[in-house]
From Swiss-Prot:
Native source species: Streptococcus thermophilus (strain CNRZ 1066)
Residues holding substrate: 12-17
Ligand binding (ATP): 10-17
Site (Interaction with substrate tRNA): 101, 127
Record protein name field: tRNA dimethylallyltransferase
Example GO molecular function: tRNA dimethylallyltransferase activity
Disulfide-bonded cysteines: none
Region (Interaction with substrate tRNA): 35-38
Recorded superkingdom: Bacteria
Extent of the signal sequence: none
Length: 299
């Protein structure tokens, strides 16, 4: 029997954290952060990390698990998220993954956990190679490899070819999770307004000081390449005015939100909800209750 879990996905600034906490309170859950930047200690404002008050409202996992000068990969996330899910379920609670890093979520949910002996850079390079092929070329590779998959589509073909190449046993690498993926969305202009407002609020909370500390101490770290920090470095070096740097930050965040939505729409099976709808979030809660009770209803 597969483990049921909830995923709250969507672009930045749509309220994923707030919904995740509400669902954790209603359904006896614990939250696993699915954000590539929130793993870093001392980076709180620019990563939009859950506040101490929010973390007190629901148990959070995979927040503050790396120092800012350490690297973090999709493989690290999958390995640690699997352990967190096992722990949460063992205590009779519901795992709720909250985040906007599409690669991390897809890697966990669709079985890209290929084992510690596999070079994840090789996996990603092979995935990039496959994505350059046409549908016909992909399906021909499936046929020539003798791989059997239940449903032929581009996403499943790429996944199957990866597993075939890097795993000794395709069946054993199948994901053991049954996710309900909640995608938060809204009118593009409203999302962009929320992003602009959020950046202004981050500045009020001390984003400049946080980014300056990172610039002074770890300017070459992986964590420093995240949106919210790198855009401010030209200001610190005197190459741009503060207004120019903040406008670039807002612009990059808006573009990132657009890429996030594209990823979730094209690469994952997501149930989308408009956050400005009068039915939200009750419609999410109702659908989730049905999903969680399906097993009992079948008995």
């Amino acid at each position: 029997m597969k483990t049921k879990l909830i995923v709250v996905a969507g672009p930045t600034a749509v309220g994923k954290t707030a919904l995740g906490i509400e669902l954790a309170e209603r359904f006896n859950g614990e939250i696993i952060s699915g954000d590539s930047q929130q793993v870093y200690r001392q980076l709180n404002i620019g990563t939009a990390k859950a506040t101490p008050e929010e973390q007190a409202a629901a148990v959070h996992h995979l927040i503050d698990v790396r120092d800012v000068d350490e690297s973090y990969s999709a493989y690290d996330f999958v390995t640690e998220a699997q352990a967190a899910i096992t722990d949460i379920v063992s205590r009779g609670k519901l795992p709720i993954i909250v985040g906007g890093t599409g690669l991390y979520l897809q890697s966990l949910l669709e079985g890209y956990h290929l084992g510690g002996k596999v070079d994840q850079n090789q996996v990603l390079a092979y995935r990039s190679e496959l994505e350059q092929l046409s549908d016909q070329q992909l399906f021909e590779k499936i046929d020539s490899s003798g791989i059997e998959i239940k449903e032929i589509n581009r996403r499943r073909a790429i996944r199957a070819l990866e597993l075939y190449r890097f795993s000794d046993n395709l069946e054993n690498t199948e994901t053991c999770y049954e996710p309900f993926i909640i995608g938060l969305d809204d009118e593009r202009s409203l999302i962009y307004d929320r992003i602009n407002t959020r950046v202004d609020k981050m500045v009020e909370l001390g984003l400049l000081e946080e980014a300056k500390w990172l610039y002074d101490n770890f300017p070459e770290a992986q964590s420093a390449r995240g949106i919210g920090y790198k855009e401010l470095f030209p200001y610190f070096s005197g190459e741009q005015t503060l207004d120019e740097a903040l406008e670039k930050l807002k612009q990059n965040t808006r573009r990132f939100a657009k890429r996030q939505l594209t990823w979730f729409r094209n690469r994952m099976t997501v149930s989308f909800y408009q956050i400005s709808s009068p039915e939200y979030p009750e419609n999410v809660i109702q659908d989730l209750a049905i999903f969680l009770n399906e097993e009992e209803g079948e008995k």
